Amino acid sequence: VLEPQEDRYEFAWLDCVMDRFAQEGMFVFLATPSGSKPMWLSEKYPEVRRVNKDGRRDASGGRHNHCMSSPVYRAKTAQMNRALAERYKNHPALALWHVGNEFSGECHCDVCRINFQKWLKTKYQTLEALNEAWWSNFWNHTFTDWSQIPTFDQSIDGLTVDWLRFTNDQHISFLRNEMAPLRELTPNVPCTTNFMGTHEGTNYWEWSEHLDIISNDLYPMPDDREETWKQSIASDFIHSLMRGMSGGKPWILLECSPSSVNWGQ
């Protein structure tokens, strides 16, 4: 919608939306579109599409299926964000940047694999230290070269844990890459991204150090799967986490629903 063809932007419709909000005395949390890449981008640069554990590259459609390590996708998202910031940096309705959307998932492409191996080398320095930490000698899984290390092997718990830590770091790196042009051009406009409570494999405490405001999505399910009091306790626990990560300052509930949702059934 914003970039129907490479390097051709269409902001007219968004101009109308932003202007209407300003006329009504309202403010906008403007989101960047990185969570769902356009079809032309996937077709021209197939390397931006994620690769799953068994080596298959994801299809072009859907969302949250881009490679966080892809130099092409990082460059394209930064370019888009720069264009957005240039256009709306002085707009009276712009109050906050909502960067991306619900960062999640992992990619097992060659770029991510090589980056993972570099990440491990930085952490452990030597293969001897890595093998000892992972107890790789068990079942004869000793690594003798960094290039031998895969991104997925459920038989090695240490590898699995480090892969999750690496993926968390890649998401943070991607987030910072997105925020760079926004902070350069609109230094007085805060940046946030929507957390997902206690999302598995994500260290939001580390993420919080890079954000100006903490925000979260919360979808209590009003059905028979769980008693209301249990959902209330779970929601309050997540609210407390957000308050803790924000240092006691206000945080934002970016997404919520008062009723059931189709994807929750």
Model-identified regions with their sequence ranges:
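A cross-domain feature marking catalytic cores of carbohydrate-active enzymes
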Residues: 1, 30-34, 99-101, 193-195, ...
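Aromatic-lined substrate-binding rim segments of carbohydrate-active enzymes
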Residues: 1-59, 81-85, 172-186
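Short, solvent-exposed loop/turn segments at secondary-structure junctions
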Residues: 1-3, 199-200, 260-263
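Acidic (Asp/Glu)-rich catalytic clusters
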Residues: 16-25, 85-92, 204-209, 242-248
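Polysaccharide-binding and catalytic clefts of secreted carbohydrate-active enzymes
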Residues: 42-44, 54-224, 228-237
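Carbohydrate-binding surfaces of carbohydrate-active enzymes
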Residues: 219-222, 228-265
